[in-house]
A protein has these predicted regions:
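A short glycine-rich, His/Asp/Glu-containing loop-to-beta-strand
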Residues: 1-36, 40
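Double-stranded beta-helix
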Residues: 3, 85-122
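Conserved hydrophobic/aromatic beta-strand scaffold that supports enzyme active sites
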Residues: 21-25, 43, 65, 73-75
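A generic "binding-loop/recognition-motif" signal
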Residues: 30, 39-40, 80, 88-89, ...
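Structural motif
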Residues: 31, 50-52, 73, 81, ...
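Glycine- and acidic-residue-biased ligand/ion/polar-headgroup-sensing regions
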Residues: 39-58
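Short acidic-glycine-tyrosine-enriched beta hairpin
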Residues: 57-81
């Protein structure tokens, strides 16, 4: 379902406990206010138009602007203030996801159980 925004429209494509995936349409000159996501990464992938993503670094000391065209993307780290604005009418995908899982996010126990059962059945 599409929702109207001051800057255009957004449509929720997929939501799970781990990600939120939105399609956004931003009118030329449309922009979102400065904000941050405390624990989520924010990724923008542009399919048409041009989107400028402004990220505030070093407690506002530096504003990093990335202008994205079709098939280009960028990410914003958790806790970074950012905003976006459309240089031209833009369609993009916006993805939110939590801090990356640790590399050791899977613990297997079946191997030990299987080996123990094999050894005790002899």
């Amino acid at each position: 379902m599409k929702s109207g925004k001051v800057w255009g429209e957004t449509e929720l494509v997929l939501q799970t406990p781990f990600i939120e995936f939105h399609r956004i349409w931003v009118h030329q000159g449309g922009f979102c206010s400065l904000h941050k996501h405390e624990f989520k990464w924010n990724m923008f992938y542009v399919t048409s138009g041009e989107l400028a993503v402004h990220t505030h670094k070093n407690d506002y000391d530096l504003i990093d602007t990335t202008v994205l065209g079709p098939r280009q993307w960028t990410t914003v780290k958790p806790g970074e203030y950012h905003s976006f604005e459309a240089v031209h009418d833009t369609m993009a995908f916006e993805l939110y996801y939590p801090e990356p899982l640790s590399k050791i996010s899977l613990e297997r126990q079946w191997e030990d159980i299987f080996l123990n059962e094999c050894n005790t059945s002899r």
